[in-house]
Amino acid sequence: MEPNTKYWNKDRMPSVRIVFDNIISKSDALKAVAAGDGKVDVVTMVTPSEAMAFKSDNAKIVMAKAKTVLVGVFNQNKPDSPWKDIKVRQAMNMAIDRKALIEKGEGGHAELIPAMIQPGRFGYNDSLKPYALDASKAGEVLKAAKIPDATVAIGAGEDQKALFDAMTEQLAKVGLKTKMVDPKGDDFDVKLVWHFDWSPQFPVGVVHREFFGKDGAFRAMPEDPQFDAMFAKLLATPKLEDQEPIVRDIEKYVYDQANVLFLYSPHTLYAVSNRVSFQPYDTFMLELAETKIVKGQ
């Protein structure tokens, strides 16, 4: 991509040529940015384990608190699914120590959130608190649910192995075993799903709808007429100041229903060469409008 010298905003005039390399492997890209030779200046989607292992005098890890969310989607579509019972879903939420998951599964690179929206963001409901850990109560409910073989199949990718191991350790305390299954299949009880809000101020349309709406890509439960009605009300409300109370109500509704295992908001990590000044965006989108070559480089 070449800089547009005719760009209308002189204060934000692009000044660098941008080359995207989607062929190079992640490991080679990290080695290249660490070398500082200018072949690679920014590596996106860096994992916590990669960030912890990254050492360089020529580059650094840049962290952004983007509008991301990681949840476990309960599979309510299975015949005789125990997750159709709201008490069982809530019990699973009470079985998890989220702070410990953040440390062991993400190396500390995440923010604790009660549901789907981060504190301070549009629609955040400050009346909500993350589900409190109560292993004793959770264990009683989950035992009574008679989950087949007392085993929870967790859909997770290899890059989520540390998180899976941390969840396994915690669920053992409430009498449950785990097994890791392909997240692309349907043979899961709980599937780990990462998503992000790329919108300016429309989290319900971009995030909540994907998990709970009738046309949601991640929905693994029967249609929820109550959620769809609340979403329709939001769509029929033109003024932003009138929308926010509705968003807060929707956030509380999905929290109470517990149709997902609420976890946290992962940080977005980049490996960035000292040659460039890089500004990450909180939408998670890779915007390079403010990226510049540092003088003297």
What do the predicted segments below correspond to?
Residues 15-22, 148-157, 178-179, 192:
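Short, well-ordered beta-strand elements
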Residues 94, 107, 111-144, 156-162:
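Structural transition elements
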Residues 103, 141-161, 237-274:
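Bilobed periplasmic-binding protein-like "clamshell/Venus-flytrap" ligand-binding domains
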Residues 19-79, 182:
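Extracellular/periplasmic solute-recognition and catalytic clefts
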Residues 79-120, 162-163, 254-259:
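Periplasmic-binding protein-like
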Residues 7-15, 53-65, 71-86, 122-137, ...:
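Short, solvent-exposed loop/beta-turn-alpha elements that line the ligand-binding surface or hinge
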Residues 33, 38-41, 45, 164, ...:
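Periplasmic binding protein-like
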Residues 1-9, 135-141, 147, 153-166, ...:
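Bilobed "Venus flytrap"/periplasmic-binding protein-like clamshell domains
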